[in-house]
């Protein structure tokens, strides 16, 4: 089924089975860790400040497959200097066959990022520890609430996740 979905054709048996939501592939698209002020930053006694940026992008690959990228940038500063910047783009290819556009949109905006998030959390924590810093654990994110906010913004004229190329912020 995987090759058929990625190639844009659903197998006849799949069509008879009804709607389907499948995880075709989960992968790291991009990863970066920078600690521009190491090793001096390890001795900084200032309270660290963390800034988290979260972004979701959706790209239609064909009629039945979408790439969803969950991007996280975590910046830690201490004493006005950057301690580290960890950036992760975790991606997945998801098959959506026989679903209405609204159902596809909900899955892309809620379930797909929920599936990708544990991978992001682990990778961010591992990067930070490998950089010599105490672990940081991303707290759970309510993607349903973020999707509801996206719907509210969309009511002001934006398009759906399924209709767009790279689109959607979470």
Swiss-Prot record:
GO biological process: protein folding; protein tetramerization; protein transport
GO cellular component terms, semicolon-separated: cytoplasm
Record localization: Cytoplasm
Main location: cytoplasm
InterPro entries assigned: SecB, SecB-like_sf
This protein's UniProt keywords: Chaperone, Cytoplasm, Protein transport, Translocation, Transport
Organism domain of life: Bacteria
Keyword Flavoprotein: no
Record GO terms (molecular function): unfolded protein binding
Matches recorded under NCBIfam families: PRK05751.1-2, PRK05751.1-4, secB
Record-stated family: Belongs to the SecB family.
Known function: One of the proteins required for the normal export of preproteins out of the cell cytoplasm. It is a molecular chaperone that binds to a subset of precursor proteins, maintaining them in a translocation-competent state. It also specifically binds to its receptor SecA.
Quaternary structure (record): Homotetramer, a dimer of dimers. One homotetramer interacts with 1 SecA dimer.
PANTHER family found in the cross-reference section: PROTEIN-EXPORT PROTEIN SECB, PTHR36918
Protein name, as recorded: Protein-export protein SecB
Gene source species: Xanthomonas campestris pv. campestris (strain ATCC 33913 / DSM 3586 / NCPPB 528 / LMG 568 / P 25)
Taxonomic classification: Bacteria, Pseudomonadati, Pseudomonadota, Gammaproteobacteria, Lysobacterales
